[in-house]
Amino acid sequence: ELRYLQLQIRPHFYLNAITTISSLIYQDRKQDARSFIDFLSDYLRYLFSGSDTQVTLQQETKHCKSFIQLQQIKYPDTIFYMFELASGTENIRIPKFLLQTVVENIFKHGFSPEQFLSIFLESALEEQNGVRGLRMTVEDNGCGFPPEMLASFPVKEDNGHVGLSNLYHTLQLIYGPAASLHISNAEPNGARVTIFLPEEENHAHPSRG
């Protein structure tokens, strides 16, 4: 049975969120605390919303924004993001948590509170190898991918980026070989993840939500 990125309860995430709220209140940053709770509510509502395995690109990017905004409150003046969705891509359905996995990977491996982080996400309708579909690119200015991962990806290794390897293999199961997930390093620094999903009628293995 095909199972797509089953939601796992991560106690440390919730404990960190509670600690952050407590810290904001202690620092008398009451408005930030209220905003944090609002973004956290949006984030959790998405996580626990029904059993759908697919959502629109617009829904997924809104969820990613909630996560980034939580980090912006926690680390003020250190994070910038820009999302640009091409016209006609907003309502295309994609696997739920697809982009969340990529964005969370940035904060797990490419973010240091001492350095300013920029995140860019864009979408476009393109054709690859004669197949039309949706291309999504997520880029940051963090530390980038280690050379050994660039050389071995998508083979699963103990490099801390197992989530991206799992994502690649999951997309192959859902869409077949027409789907792709490529990783590279941006210039002058940072990581880039490019995902291509074929149009619905081209799915080799359509996902049923």
Regions found by a protein language model. Give the residues of each.
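Two-component histidine phosphotransfer core
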Residues: E1-S184, P188-F196
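Generic C-terminal helix-cap and adjacent flexible tail
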Residues: E199-G209
